[in-house]
From Swiss-Prot:
Keywords: DNA-binding, Transcription, Transcription regulation. It comes from Methanosarcina acetivorans (strain ATCC 35395 / DSM 2834 / JCM 12185 / C2A). Contains an N-terminal DNA-binding winged helix-turn-helix domain and a C-terminal regulatory domain (or effector binding domain) resembling phosphoribosyltransferase (PRT) domain. This is Transcriptional regulator GfcR 1. Belongs to the purine/pyrimidine phosphoribosyltransferase family. GfcR subfamily. Pfam families: Pribosyltran (PF00156). The lineage of its organism: Archaea, Methanobacteriati, Methanobacteriota, Stenosarchaea group, Methanomicrobia.
Length: 204
């Protein structure tokens, strides 16, 4: 994306294609609040100040299986470094749909672990209190397992928190979260260490 007008145009295009706010946020790697602002601004209704957010475009990595492979190796190295400190092992790598899946499947292969897939609730436009995402039954089980959570970007940390809570409710042990970009700048979420290739910290 070149500028704010490109982001607005892409957000409107995605909405016209049937994506809901959470899915648009995931696709553009921005918060739901930013998507709402982009869509409101496209209608030129009211001048509302822009939320403080950063759009991350990692498509130059995502379009190449070779680049994804090398990035997954770097994330594996960081995950193993974290696990060594606690003498923990990894049983299952949990990919957060949709953007965490390619990296998670490659990491599971590299780490010799099972692969599980988590469908977040962010794909729903209206999220009811207590509503949760789900672990797909078509992939590995997480029950009683040591888990590594993999996603592309942490924006507010809400999806990561959702996955951690869901895994714990299922008797799993989330050991580390691995992401390409951490926009929240947190060392941990719910006492689970965060490993990111890039950490963004706002200074304003």
């Amino acid at each position: 994306m070149k500028n704010i007008e490109d982001l607005i145009q892409k957000a409107v295009e995605l909405q016209n294609n049937g994506l809901v706010t959470g899915q648009i946020a995931d696709e553009l790697n921005v918060s739901r609040e930013t998507v709402t602002w982009l869509l409101t601004r496209s209608k030129k209704e009211v001048a509302v100040p822009a939320p403080k957010d950063i759009s991350v475009n990692w498509s130059s990595i995502g379009k190449s299986a070779t680049r994804l492979h090398y990035i997954s190796l770097a994330l594996c190295d960081m995950v193993l470094e974290t696990l060594e400190k606690t003498n923990a092992e990894v049983d299952v790598v949990v990919g957060v749909a949709a953007s965490g899946i390619p990296l998670a499947s490659m990491m599971a292969n590299e780490l010799g672990a099972d692969f599980a897939l988590y469908h977040s609730r962010k794909g729903q436009d209206v999220v009811q209190p207590g509503q949760k995402g789900t672990i797909s039954r078509n992939f590995g089980s997480v029950v009683g397992k040591n888990c590594v959570i993999v996603d592309d970007v942490i924006t507010t940390g809400s999806t990561t928190m959702e996955v951690i809570e869901q895994l714990r409710e299922m008797g799993a042990k989330p050991r580390v979260v691995a992401v390409l970009v951490d926009k929240k700048g947190a060392d941990t979420i719910a006492n689970v260490p965060i490993q990111s290739l890039v950490r963004i910290v706002r200074v304003d």
